[in-house]
Amino acid sequence: MHFGIYGINQGAAADPEVAVGLAQLAEELGFDSLWTAGDLALPDPKPHPYAAAPATPVVHPALCLGALAEHTDHLLLVLGASEGCAQDALLWAKLGASLDHWSDGRGQLLLPPGFAADAGQGLEAEWLEALRSLWGSDVPAVEGRFHPLSNLQAAPRPIQGARLPLWVQGRSAVAVRTALQAGKGWLCPGEDLETVAEGMAMLAEEEARSERSSALGLLEVSVLAGALPSPEDLEAYEELGVDRLVLRLPPDRAQVLEAFLEDVAEAYFDDFLDEPEG
């Protein structure tokens, strides 16, 4: 199993020195990925217990990961897109491509839970088509209602080309379906073993109904943990088919965050860690 950390752009990690130190420590310990929250503003009051407090500082994810690309070598850098991202294909194509360009091919893009909510209207599908065209076509073009493209270029393109990895977040049938049809992976919110098992059962149902392009490869599943699972539960996650555990950074001081990463590595890595790629 792989391990990632979520929230490298918020809380105490909104301080650049803290974020760099945590990223380098995570890479040294064996984590494989940094995931950023895509929030541009936070709801007040908190909508659920695992949400960040309304006054939590949040640095723009693209700015954060662009800086961390310079200070890390192998970590995957997962850019959290904000709700409403499907309204602007050019912006998110540029942000994803720029991150991938600066990080030597380590960029990935995380679509928010609300992305697939109105998939039936065609906005999201056209947004994805526009990104793929801008990233991979010599002559980017989309004939569409929402994101028509013609007579433009948007260099630099991603090092990974049109298949810069996309993740879809959310525990809903439409989010799973979108991940299967267009994504590298699905980020499943998982408060506990029961909710993870329910999510994996939903994935199995959607896989039976959906046709996934062979060009996308096998779907990866990451769980965004609400709390640290027990080793027994983590073993059950593996048996269910989970590929990665993504852990939320607690909203604490730098020293506490460093200790958190070290405690996670000590608790899990000897028994569960797959070596990061690259």
Task: Annotate the PLM regions.
Residues 1-278:
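Active-site-adjacent structural elements that line small-molecule/cofactor binding pockets in enzymes
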